[in-house]
Design a protein with these regions (language model features):
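The feature captures the conserved acid-bearing segment of alpha/beta-hydrolase catalytic domains
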Residues: 130-210
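The conserved beta1-alpha1 loop
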Residues: 17-21, 127, 154
Length: 215
């Protein structure tokens, strides 16, 4: 795992972006997309690069997916809580809320993490893998989240796939949104295109929504 501070500000929310291994200038390109959409930088954005995506972001093993989904998300969350967050010195910045954000399987991880720890004021899940076996059932079985800010977005064409599990993503995402809306500040946004369309812009829209809170 590698950690990169992409945007740094002395005030506003601190956003942890859990991401896949970047390629070329991808980090800078995404940061530029965020700056272009958000404008004045009143937030800090920290990227946490996960090398083995399926292994370290899947919350549990399942017979319905291949063995690369090893269910070791807990190790990643431990690393974030024990190694990354202490370096941010959150306690000395008490009025700066901490958010976690991710795309695809990292989006699933971000929401799952909300049920594991209370350190986050909210999360953003962009094109999150809500199709993951057992996740809707997991959310239903957990104590209800309350007073959190949660941003969820999905591509309008993402469920148009021959993959049996992934084809359920729109229905499962909507079901999870409806559950969360009862006690939290939740926005659900549908974007044009499929899973990989304009990922940088989708993340930028999530950051803009988080940044608007100012606390």
């Amino acid at each position: 795992m590698q950690v990169h501070t992409l945007i740094s500000s002395g005030n506003g929310p601190i956003i942890l972006w859990v991401m896949y291994p970047h390629r070329g200038d991808e980090l800078e390109h995404t940061a530029d997309s965020i700056r272009e959409l958000v404008g004045e930088e009143q937030f800090t954005l920290v990227a946490i690069q996960i090398d083995d995506w399926n292994r370290y972001l899947s919350p549990w093993r399942s017979d319905e997916v291949d063995g690369s989904f090893a269910g070791e998300a807990g190790r990643t969350l431990d690393y974030i809580e024990q190694q990354v967050v202490p370096q941010l010195d959150i306690q000395s910045q008490a009025n700066r809320p901490l958010y976690i954000m991710g795309y695809s399987l990292a989006g699933l991880f971000a929401l799952w993490a909300m049920y594991q720890t209370d350190i986050f004021a909210g999360c953003a899940t962009c094109s999150g893998s809500m199709w993951y076996p057992g996740f809707v059932e997991y959310v239903n079985s957990q104590p209800t989240l309350a007073n959190k800010r949660i941003y969820i977005s999905l591509g309008g064409k993402e469920s148009r796939t021959s993959d049996r599990l992934m084809a359920t993503v729109a229905d499962r995402t909507k079901e999870i949104c409806d559950l969360l809306k009862k006690d939290n500040d939740v926005i659900y946004e549908i974007n044009p295109g499929g899973h990989f369309a304009d990922s940088g812009k989708r993340l930028a829209k999530a950051v803009k929504w988080i940044e608007k809170a100012k606390g």
